[in-house]
């Protein structure tokens, strides 16, 4: 019987163990998409206790707590202490067997806290609380201290076009910080013209860009100014959360002006008008990214804020999102082609939340590759509900079967937690085990030089090259 979570966790043969321990584990982390707070990095936040750093803002854990019947006051309540929330989590973790949270929890205790050989639960919670809190009181366990322990080389935060990026500038000016912290442009509120807050948001964009927006060209001018601001602060990428992927041929400016005017006047837009406006903004933005050498990321297929009662109580990003099932292939093809037809398609990473769309993306990327940039269009790693063992394996296998796994830019945390870097370890173990199994079965050569180069490229080198090449 195998022992739970040894140093060889998930590594089933000698080839896999060699690939992981000798080549994957030492590689730095290039975490090109996350939701960390740049202010917390700039301020080098110190955490009061394990409950705070572990549970604050982590909607993966919040969903598990709710599924275990825990009262909301012990999940997001302001009236309960960090310790009370922590003990609720300790009582819940033994119930998460089979869920990646069980693995992640114990990986996070191993690194950076060094707690091994102990199962987390109500019987061990007090001892672990004390041990971890003692370490959190030291400089090595500040926000940046943890990042340095985990060998993080770069993080890409997620930032709204109206953000000042003051903390990114503060970080860049601080010679004591040797981690690159790059903003990523997230313009969801710009192209989602159908949302209730669209008009109010345009007012904020006007103020940030110092441009009055009444016509579509005004919007272009405002966005150009903000794109320039992001570029000056070291932006390398954009990101777009797309629940429903729409496409319509882009109309002329007169029609776009009319659509925008209707929305500003409070009138209801038709589905066609929404699709026309959304497509126009995305295609124009994509061309701007291409000109700047940025990467365009499209996260497709979430249904967000499903629970109206809890949305009214807690707001967005609190654990009430799930997988959508809209068809995406035709609209995605047309959207990418609208940029590529003028040779203005940027480097692009496509992510799907519904795993049934894996093959759609794995084949779509082959339509739009280009010379000079290996893997110009990427099928991104298993996202959100898919960043678990089966989801990662599906993505790796389908990419390898329909594209070039060797050119893959690898894993990202997509997380709000400074303890989530062990997800890179989880991914690397799964990757090495997959290659090790193929080699053991004679499906690929047992060639250490060839396999080790591929592992190191996927773990770090490919992403570093991809995001920095113009």
Swiss-Prot record:
GO MF annotations, alphabetized: glucuronate isomerase activity
Pfam families linked to this entry: UxaC (PF02614)
Record's signal peptide: none
GO biological process, one term: D-glucuronate catabolic process
Pathway field: Carbohydrate metabolism; pentose and glucuronate interconversion
UniProt similarity note: Belongs to the metallo-dependent hydrolases superfamily. Uronate isomerase family.
Name of protein: Uronate isomerase
């Amino acid at each position: 019987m195998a022992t739970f979570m040894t140093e060889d966790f998930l590594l089933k043969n000698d080839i896999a163990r060699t690939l992981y321990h000798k080549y994957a584990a030492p590689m730095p982390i290039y975490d090109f998409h996350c939701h960390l707070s740049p202010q917390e990095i700039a301020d080098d936040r110190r955490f009061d206790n394990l409950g705070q750093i572990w549970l604050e803002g982590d909607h993966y854990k919040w969903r598990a707590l709710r599924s275990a019947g825990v009262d909301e006051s012990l999940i997001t309540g302001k009236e309960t202490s960090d310790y009370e929330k922590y003990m609720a989590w300790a009582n819940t973790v033994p119930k998460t067997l089979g869920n990646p949270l069980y693995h992640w929890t114990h990986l996070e205790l191993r690194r950076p806290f060094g707690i091994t050989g102990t199962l987390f639960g109500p019987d061990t919670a007090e001892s672990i609380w004390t041990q971890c809190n003692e370490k959190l009181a030291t400089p090595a366990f500040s926000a940046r201290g943890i990042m340095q322990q985990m060998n993080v080389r770069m993080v890409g935060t997620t930032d709204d076009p109206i953000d000042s990026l003051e903390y990114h500038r503060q970080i860049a000016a601080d010679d004591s910080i040797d981690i690159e912290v790059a903003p990523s442009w997230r313009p969801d509120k710009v192209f989602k013209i159908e949302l209730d807050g669209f008009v109010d948001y345009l007012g904020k964009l006007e103020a940030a860009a110092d441009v009055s927006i009444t016509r579509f060209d005004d919007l272009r001018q405002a966005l150009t100014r903000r794109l320039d601001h992001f570029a000056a602060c070291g932006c390398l990428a954009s990101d777009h959360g797309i629940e429903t992927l729409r496409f319509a041929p882009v109309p002329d400016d007169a029609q776009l002006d009319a659509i925008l005017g209707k929305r500003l006047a409070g009138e209801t837009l038709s589905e066609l008008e929404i699709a026309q406006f959304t497509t126009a903004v995305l295609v124009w933005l994509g061309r701007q990214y291409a000109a700047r050498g940025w990467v365009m990321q499209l996260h497709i297929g979430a249904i967000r804020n499903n629970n109206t009662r809890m949305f009214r109580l807690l707001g967005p990003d609190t654990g009430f999102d799930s997988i959508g099932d809209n068809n995406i292939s035709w609209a995605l093809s047309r959207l990418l082609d609208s940029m590529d037809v003028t040779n203005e398609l940027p480097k692009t990473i496509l992510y799907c939340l519904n795993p049934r769309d894996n093959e759609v993306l794995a084949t779509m990327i082959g339509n739009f590759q280009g010379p000079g940039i290996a893997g110009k269009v990427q099928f991104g790693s298993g996202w959100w509900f898919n960043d678990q063992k089966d989801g990662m394996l599906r993505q790796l296998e389908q990419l390898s079967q329909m594209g070039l796994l060797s050119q893959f830019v690898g894993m990202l945390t997509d997380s709000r937690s400074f303890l989530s870097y062990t997800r890179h370890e989880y991914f690397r173990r799964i990757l090495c085990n997959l290659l090790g199994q193929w080699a053991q079965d004679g499906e690929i050569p047992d060639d250490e030089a060839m396999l080790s180069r591929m592992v190191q490229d996927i773990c770090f080198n490919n992403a570093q090259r991809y995001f920095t090449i113009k």
